[in-house]
Amino acid sequence: MEPAVSLAVCALLFLLWVRVKGLEFVLIHQRWVFVCLFLLPLSLIFDIYYYVRAWVVFKLSSAPRLHEQRVQDIQKQVREWKEQGSKTFMCTGRPGWLTVSLRVGKYKKTHKNIMINLMDILEVDTKKQIVRVEPLVSMGQVTALLNSIGWTLPVLPELDDLTVGGLIMGTGIESSSHKYGLFQHICTAYELILADGSFVRCTPSENSDLFYAVPWSCGTLGFLVAAEIRIIPAKKYVKLRFEPVRGLEAICEKFTHESQRLENHFVEGLLYSLDEAVIMTGVMTDDVEPSKLNSIGSYYKPWFFKHVENYLKTNREGLEYIPLRHYYHRHTRSIFWELQDIIPFGNNPIFRYLFGWMVPPKISLLKLTQGETLRKLYEQHHVVQDMLVPMKCLSQALHTFQNDIHVYPIWLCPFILPSQPGLVHPKGDEAELYVDIGAYGEPRVKHFEARSCMRQLEKFVRSVHGFQMLYADCYMNREEFWEMFDGSLYHKLRKQLGCQDAFPEVYDKICKAARH
């Protein structure tokens, strides 16, 4: 009884403090208090609910039976929109704060919201090596199910809450992408509802133009209702090697070399300064040396990027065996390294042991509670960007990142970009090795001004035929955007499928003016 009374007293004192100081003051200056007392428990409740729901739905096999009914309901909503005169554009009815991005789309308030309640795994076919899923299935759901039956996705993007729909309509990448490409390149079929309410299935051989135009289109060609994705046999562990490297030239040379070696299942780099990095390479295995087993995903373990940094500080190479699912979600607990700015003591051993089992807070709840003042502060003093550039331009790109934003650590993830139709492809006719440069944090460049600095960075990326991930703030104008992306097939299909009066153009959904 005494702990309950103490907790009640603490809660009462906190509420009185909030009343005196004001909620906005607390959310800005003591955000960690609000996050620890409210968002962490709420996030845990969300996770438990969705895990239990997904488990029950899959065990009862109810998702396939309900799927057709849900798709018909979406078709009905689209046809009703047409009957009512098609007065506004359509978009999904999913609230903007639920998406894994820093901003919320303004268009949700002005467009016709089509409710899409599709969040289940429909089928796992191990003979065809395919999993069929609905668009709101998360990576956490996928790994929980597939790994338990000995399978996995060839490319399984990092954060638990990333959804299949977001990874197709936007993009997704992981440290296996040097072998398999982006998330779109492991997809074998898409099912969509078009602007007229009709259903269509597209594959590389059936409705192929639409199949190649859907990725990166952000829901502006139709509503995704299901996807078929390749699966491969999984093993229990990842045998991961850590190698600290110093000197930018040596870093680029080592990273490029390891990215070209297809015997590596996983390749990743963490850059802690312009001339200090740790390059990691891994292979899946069922064998393990018990003394080198590291369950890095356990709640009491150090954050992964801090653990990796120790190899740099001690200037030693390392070899560890990490459980496969722990490896896939190695950056989840610390949201890469963003959580250190929200909970500064989050990696403290005492905090990890007492409260680490509730970490991380859900990104969607962080967005929902950030408030206008905090949003503006983040916009001017915080960067979250992923720029995709040819591997041959890595050194030049890292110098540009250093000069324009100066954010560390930097995430380096290689990927092969096939020469295929669509919004994103190499400049030549052959596949090319690219690298995702991820910068997340507070810029340390003097006199940082978000718009001018980011426009400078975007200009560089365009000049080397690179691409900007569309979840991030985009300061390009329309002409610059279509200089970066190949819109030829996309615009052809927009006209052919009657999308011009049904959905906004992709630029109008992702540009800075379209988000707040």
UniProtKB/Swiss-Prot annotation:
Q: List the disulfide bonds.
A: none
Catalyses which reaction(s) = cholesterol + NADP(+) = desmosterol + NADPH + H(+); lanosterol + NADPH + H(+) = 24,25-dihydrolanosterol + NADP(+); 5alpha-cholest-8-en-3beta-ol + NADP(+) = zymosterol + NADPH + H(+)
| Membrane side Lumenal: residue ranges | 23-31
Signal sequence annotation = 1-22
The UniProt family comment states: Belongs to the FAD-binding oxidoreductase/transferase type 4 family.
One Pfam family named in its UniProt record: FAD_binding_4
Q: What is the name listed in the Swiss-Prot or TrEMBL entry for this protein?
A: Delta(24)-sterol reductase
Query: How is this protein organized at the quaternary level?
Result: Interacts with DHCR7; this interaction regulates DHCR7 activity.
Q: Which Enzyme Commission number(s) are on file for it?
A: 1.3.1.72
The record's keywords, sorted A to Z, are: Cholesterol biosynthesis, Cholesterol metabolism, Endoplasmic reticulum, FAD, Flavoprotein, Golgi apparatus, Lipid biosynthesis, Lipid metabolism, Membrane, NADP, Oxidoreductase, Signal, Steroid biosynthesis, Steroid metabolism, Sterol biosynthesis, Sterol metabolism, Transmembrane, Transmembrane helix
Domain FAD-binding PCMH-type: start-end pairs = 58-234
Q: Where is this site: Cleavage?
A: L122, E123, V383, V384
MF terms (GO), sorted A to Z: Delta24(24-1) sterol reductase activity; Delta24-sterol reductase activity; enzyme binding; FAD binding; oxidoreductase activity; oxidoreductase activity, acting on the CH-CH group of donors, NAD or NADP as acceptor; peptide antigen binding
Q: What does the function comment of this entry state?
A: Catalyzes the reduction of the delta-24 double bond of sterol intermediates during cholesterol biosynthesis. In addition to its cholesterol-synthesizing activity, can protect cells from oxidative stress by reducing caspase 3 activity during apoptosis induced by oxidative stress. Also protects against amyloid-beta peptide-induced apoptosis.
